[in-house]
From Swiss-Prot:
It comes from Buxus microphylla (Littleleaf boxwood). It catalyses: 2 a plastoquinone + 4 hnu + 2 H2O = 2 a plastoquinol + O2. It is an enzyme of class 1 (oxidoreductase). This is Photosystem II D2 protein. Photosystem II (PSII) is a light-driven water:plastoquinone oxidoreductase that uses light energy to abstract electrons from H(2)O, generating O(2) and a proton gradient subsequently used for ATP formation. It consists of a core antenna complex that captures photons, and an electron transfer chain that converts photonic excitation into a charge separation. The D1/D2 (PsbA/PsbD) reaction center heterodimer binds P680, the primary electron donor of PSII as well as several subsequent electron acceptors. D2 is needed for assembly of a stable PSII complex. It holds the Pfam family Photo_RC.
């Protein structure tokens, strides 16, 4: 008996094949299957943000002005989180809160959930786009894996943290000054700077910046095919097509500087990938911990001694007092519905912390 092995061919393409051919066609802007998620979500997220920062007030949710229409500028405008009373409602336009009324939906903070959810799926779509293109041109998927780090940070800060708290109210609003206020909130209520996961994140981001600067300078320093452009300094031609720097020379240089150096390009570039991605992932895990109100380092012995001995003080105990001041000021301002009334003697007074 003879068995013929071969690929099964269809006489005519079905709808999937037609869609696949159109979506993945080589064009100026690649669409792909991931584009079905990326482009609509990115469009709605950016459109919602521009709409909110231009027209929508935060008076009903935070008692604040937050739009260009009210006099804010690029640094102070924001799309604000919903009120605390709305808890974790998705705030759908057709939901029980807004009941299809667009103006009421904006007043309630519906644009924030709209931007946050479409933004999250837009970022995921961008990562899938990198997977799809890498597969199409037979590359490894490390670009997509690296991009998972900022996605993890976004999801942990904007979605998981408020899900662990009482509502979307405690997430950051989408604006520059709003993010700064959220950072102060994190410090005052969670002592975030003393959290080991934050420390790993800082080490990852700053370490990556250092590696990037060193790597770029080293490659430029060890070019062995000089450019001859009249408008720039020698040995630098940004349009040079081929790779003409000396890894051996770079290795000798850094071996003399540090005593150690990367021996090959693969290990060097993997390390440049590993440092920032690991740092961002660690900080994302730390924010998940804050969602559950896990504490940072507590040096209680220093606090007790500082309370007993007026002459004993450390930078740690000063920071703890500063955090208490942040909490005392922010809690009453940010949560007026709680009717938090602090007696005058516990409120911070200028520098007398």
């Amino acid at each position: 008996m003879t068995i013929a092995l071969g690929r099964f061919t269809k006489d005519e393409n079905d709808l999937f094949d037609i869609m696949d051919d159109w979506l993945r066609r080589d064009r100026f802007v690649f669409v792909g299957w991931s584009g079905l998620l990326l482009f609509p979500c990115a469009y709605f997220a950016l459109g919602g943000w521009f709409t909110g920062t231009t027209f929508v007030t935060s008076w009903y949710t935070h008692g604040l002005a937050s739009s260009y229409l009210e006099g804010c500028n690029f640094l102070t405008a924001a799309v604000s989180t919903p009120a605390n009373s709305l808890a974790h409602s998705l705030l759908l336009l057709w939901g029980p809160e807004a009941q299809g009324d667009f103006t009421r939906w904006c007043q309630l903070g519906g644009l924030w959930t709209f931007v946050a959810l479409h933004g999250a799926f837009g970022l995921i779509g961008f990562m899938l786009r990198q997977f799809e293109l890498a597969r199409s041109v037979q590359l490894r998927p490390y670009n997509a894996i690296a991009f998972s780090a900022p996605i993890a940070v976004f999801v942990s800060v904007f979605l998981i943290y408020p899900l662990g708290q009482s509502g979307w109210f405690f997430a950051p609003s989408f604006g520059v000054a709003a993010i700064f206020r959220f950072i102060l909130f994190f410090q005052g209520f969670h002592n975030w700077t003393l959290n080991p996961f934050h420390m790993m994140g800082v080490a990852g981001v700053l370490g990556a910046a250092l590696l990037c600067a060193i790597h770029g300078a080293t490659v430029e320093n060890t070019l062995f095919e000089d450019g001859d452009g009249a408008n720039t300094f020698r040995a630098f031609n940004p349009t040079q097509a081929e790779e003409t720097y000396s890894m051996v020379t770079a290795n000798r240089f850094w071996s003399q500087i540090f005593g150690v150096a990367f021996s090959n390009k693969r290990w060097l570039h993997f390390f440049m990938l590993f440092v920032p991605v690991t740092g961002l992932w660690m900080s994302a895990l730390g924010v998940v911990g804050l969602a559950l109100n896990l504490r940072a380092y507590d040096f209680v012995s220093q606090e007790i001694r500082a309370a007993e001995d007026p002459e004993f003080e450390t930078f740690y105990t000063k920071n703890i007092l500063l955090n208490e001041g942040i909490r005392a000021w922010m809690a009453a301002q940010d949560q007026p519905h709680e009717n938090l009334i602090f007696p005058e003697e516990v409120l911070p007074r200028g520098n007398a912390l």
